[in-house]
Amino acid sequence: LGGYIIMKRKALAITLAAAMAMGTCAVTASAADGDKYTIGICQLVQHEALDAATQGFKDEVTKELGEDAVTFDEQNAQGDSNTCSTIINSFVSNNVDLILANATPALQAAAAGTSDIPILGTSVTEYGVALGLDDFDGTVGGNISGTADLAPLDQQAAMLNELFPDAKNVGLLYCSAEANSQYQVDTVKAELEKLGYTCEYYAFSDSNDLSSVATTATDASDVIYVPTDNTVASNTEIINNICLPAKVPVITGEEGICSGCGVATLSISYYDLGV
């Protein structure tokens, strides 16, 4: 598979000092004057990719500011977007200096929760889709900035074609509740159809119907494609237990999902994404 297994790509590099300078609470990233900062971290759910992004962020902030200059209030929403809103509201009430919103629902909750506290998003595939920005040009503006985990979707399609040139039917398996997953499968579908594949959507609403939808997709497909998707990332064992015995290969949108149920991916490094 050569260089097709993992491709690291850091996107939208940001300095902490610049991010903290946005909005009304301007901050200089220097611990020399004795300032102490509180950073609220809202992570949608615990899985390998999001954990790595959070850890990369914490490591870099600690390196830049010093261990004694920053306190992290780290909260996990357990996959519930409503809990994201509750967490963000607590950060706003506590007047934290910065919010790290890890994953799209966390970013959406943060954007709705405050226009004053600086927000950094991470593990967000497409900010325009996430925030409903029709004319998104790569800059959100206001108090929001961040890093994107959008993989090279055209190259993922090309990789699938290189690995499985004789396949005809590709099943696109994704969570319909995740807007960025829809964006990815739409893009990959268009690329695969250019290459002559027949593609079919297999959307599940949550983890409860993943098994039945994955089974249907496996029965009808030569290859399965799953995008960068938080529900998939938390339930790779379900997919693996269905696709592996059926000998239907799975191409994935990121490294953590690939390690759980896939055969190949082109992926960013989520640790680097958080840095």
Predicted regions and their residues:
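An alpha-beta-alpha
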Residues: I39-I41, F57, S145-L192
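Hydrophobic alpha-helical segments within soluble ligand-binding/sensing domains
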Residues: Y127-K168, I268-V275
